[in-house]
Amino acid sequence: GVLWGYIADRYGTRWFGLIAAFAMSGSLFALSQQESILQFYGLYFLFGAFGNAMVTSPLFANVGFWFTHKPGLALGITASGGAVGQAVVPYLCALSLEQYGWQTTYMLSAACYLALALPVALLIRESPGRELARLQPVDEVRTFPLSEREVIMWISVAIIFCCTCMSVPIVHLVPLLTDSGFSLDEATTVLMVLMLSGALGRVLGGRLGDLIGALPSYMVMSAGQTLSVFWFPFLDSTEAIYLVAVVFGFTYSGVMSAILVCTRMMVSAKFGARAMSITSFFGWFGMGAGGFMGGYLFDLTGNYEASFMGAMIVGCVNFAILLLFALRIRRQSRGLDEQAV
């Protein structure tokens, strides 16, 4: 993703969707024919490196800079598609697996993705703002008080803890519920509801960034995510579990949109794709760390209480970093205002 961010800032994203459409559908079809674990890992590497990585951060940067009015809403709507896919596609694949088996499911996935993605990919155009910035020999004039490097440093550090917090329920909610006596169907339905509420959370999280500011939106959604994640192991009623799942899904997805809006509003168009790719890199690291942490603490204690309490603690660390970031911005802004006077 970081490599594609550099390429996108230098050459644009005009053909990214088209390349990704063929890469992902081709990888899915090849997976239907794989016969070894090395082929399995290799094909998923191709799927991620030449597919998913090309249609996430670089295209988010493109979308964000297409809109000067309500860019947060535009990014939120774009990001919400991922939440819908995370809820619906696994459910449909599970039905297909039961009916047709894994090979046919991979082939159907490849055909469906190509049929859906190819026409959309042909419509992608580079945003005029990014295209103009790329052609200008001098850097854009920025009004944000911190340098782009410092902005990316703050967001990257925060996002590690933020994504560590959110990935614990995403990875461990289903086993937590099945261990608590829920059936697998009930547990996966809760996860699907969580993801679907995330689609709305991404839209409203982006819009909130337009209304109250990018960083305040990030902090509000982070607080909601941190407060809600703690309660999962201590709930015993179905209604309470669904309620907390909806709240967590809404806020964790709002966090994801808020991160995109922060990056969009704090860096220049010329640096946008690289910035989003770098922060996403650290976000994926945090997602992996959270999944590992939740499993490790479960193995250590024999229950999920420590895992979800650990998620809340790293969520608090994330919020503290964001608070320091906000104070740093305020202090730097005051210093610049005093210099101007």
State where each predicted segment sits:
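Interfacial helix-cap and linker-helix signal at transmembrane-aqueous boundaries
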Residues: 7-8, 88-100, 177-178, 208-209, ...
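C-terminal ends and interior cores of transmembrane alpha-helices
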Residues: 22-35, 224-236
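Hydrophobic core of transmembrane alpha-helices in multi-pass small-molecule transporters
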Residues: 27, 38-54, 160, 240-254
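Intracellular juxtamembrane helix-capping segments at the cytosolic ends
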Residues: 53-67, 254-267
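Helix-loop-helix hairpin linking two adjacent transmembrane segments in secondary transporters
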Residues: 78-126
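A late C-terminal transmembrane helix in Major Facilitator Superfamily
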Residues: 86, 266-303, 311
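Extracytoplasmic gate region of multi-pass secondary transporters
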Residues: 150-207
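C-terminal transmembrane helical hairpin of 12-TM major facilitator-type secondary transporters
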Residues: 192-204, 209-262
